[in-house]
Amino acid sequence: MEEHLKKRPQKKVFPKVKIDSLRNQAIEKIKSKLLPDEKIIKITLIGSSVKNSFGEYEPPGFRGSLFSDFDFILFVEDDFEIPKWLDREPDGKPFPDNSMNLAYRNKKFIEDKYDVEVFFIRESNAQNPAIQKLGEEAGIPMTSDSKHKHIIVYSKD
């Protein structure tokens, strides 16, 4: 696990009904902002909203927010252009090659409170077994038999 992830403050988990509602809002909004786009292969949601541990952090919060964020993984064609409404997230570094660490964030994406983090994985990298292994080790569901809990939000196929 990345070092900064170990230093999170305590979190008060929201009731499941609230998590489900917020998660559905985030899924609908990400789809409305990104689709249709022929260069998007798959959109996957991972993290606390899928594991039912989404909630509010004790001050000072984590990554500039008092709340959990929504973690989307986008598998895209190699020539996909990352949308301008997303800002680069310098802390998202699961891969040793920094050119592959395409982590982006949009602050207050849902209800003016909850951030979205979007991590892009280019198709040529997604098909590389060594990169699949690194991604899986970092908690990213890279393969169809991944052990990591996730929701497939969209798939081109």
Regions found by a protein language model. Name each.
Residues 1-67, 75-157:
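Catalytic core of pol beta-like nucleotidyltransferases
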Residues 71:
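Cell-envelope/extracellular polymer assembly enzymes that use nucleotide-activated donors
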